[in-house]
A protein has these predicted regions:
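Hydrophobic helix-and-loop "lid/oligomerization" segment in the mid-to-C-terminal part
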Residues: 1-171, 242
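Mid-to-C-terminal polyanion-binding domains and interfaces
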Residues: 51-93, 138, 146-316
Length: 316
């Protein structure tokens, strides 16, 4: 089953935790999100190659459908959230007929973009069913359970980093205001700029294949043990090119002429994509995670970009 799924994902190298989490995992889950929940389990249990290939192809189709639905909901949710402000203690959005199978994914995207707890709610038949994602230090599940006990929400619960809720449509605004207040009491306020945890400063010549291999052996990583995030300070952008409509491929280096490749997914959903694309040789602080890229039998290190800061020109 996994071999058939890897073929559909065009994965031709030994899978890493990243591949499992971001290539194979979403395809296995696609059945539960927009199709039949048992498809992934049937694929993994299949001992017949023909059956496995058929199930993998079906999951690939459903995953494509899931992405299309997700992109539509994501665009609308981001528009709403940006109008309210991505610097609020809680970032949230709600819409009619938003597919329940993608609201959690969209909430994750909002959380990553804002670095705030985020909730996305799909409205249907007078009720809103939503999913939330949190950040370190904010117990979203407990906050939602608090609102259930107060009678603000019909039901809800979860854990520190993720939770679900059900609320009457006419109560959504009030419920989100109360949830935002609870989160603010825990230490997030709308005047505090979002922060990004950084583990170490690194120079391009230290970003070796051996280093990345050692980091991979220390995994797998997750919410409780995130993969290390490095800063490359005062780097000059050498090359930048848009990949598709949303992503950015680039390379950067220091004065010692050591050049490293980078990739920024969904870069053009913020100012990062356009700013780096139109770099004109300017210098940036770059923050992200290191990974191995394999292409045509060649292995190299690349930076998966999380954030960037343009260095302001210094006065002479």
């Amino acid at each position: 089953g996994l071999v058939a799924l890897a073929d559909q994902a065009k994965l031709d190298t030994a899978p890493t935790p990243y591949h499992l989490g971001f290539l194979l995992g979403p395809r296995i889950n696609a059945g539960g999100r927009v199709g039949n929940a048992d498809l992934g389990a049937r694929l993994l249990m299949s001992e017949n190659s023909e059956e496995a290939e058929g199930l993998a192809a079906l999951l690939e189709t459903l995953n494509t459908e899931r992405r299309e639905i997700e992109e539509d909901v994501c665009a609308n949710a981001f528009k709403q959230a940006e109008e309210r402000g991505l610097d609020k203690p809680l970032v949230w959005a709600a819409g009619e007929n938003w597919h329940p199978g993608v609201v959690g994914i969209v909430a994750s995207r909002l959380k990553e973009a804002s670095r705030r707890p985020a909730v996305v709610i799909g409205i249907d038949a007078g009720e809103g069913k939503g999913s939330g994602r949190s950040i370190t230090g904010i117990d979203l599940g407990a906050a939602i359970q608090n609102l259930v006990e107060q009678g603000v929400l019909l039901k809800g619960g979860g854990h520190k980093m993720a939770a679900g809720l059900t609320v009457k449509t006419q109560e959504i605004e009030i419920a989100m205001e109360k949830l935002s207040s609870l989160i603010k009491q825990k230490g997030i306020d709308d005047k505090e700029p979002p922060s990004l945890h950084l583990d170490s400063v690194l120079m391009p010549n230290a970003a070796t294949i051996e280093l990345v291999e050692h980091l991979e052996k220390a995994g797998p990583y997750g919410a409780g043990a995130p993969s290390p995030r490095f800063v490359f300070a005062n780097m000059q952008i050498i090359f930048a090119k848009r990949v598709g409509e949303k992503h950015l491929k680039f390379s950067f280096g220091d004065s010692r002429e050591r050049i490293l490749d980078g990739i920024a997914f969904d870069a053009f959903k913020s100012a990062i994509g356009e700013t780096i694309e139109q770099h004109s040789g300017r210098r940036f602080h770059l923050a992200g995670r290191l990974e191995l890229n394999e292409w045509q039998g060649r292995r190299s290190v690349q930076l998966r970009l999380d954030d960037a800061a343009l260095l302001q020109a210094q006065a002479a």
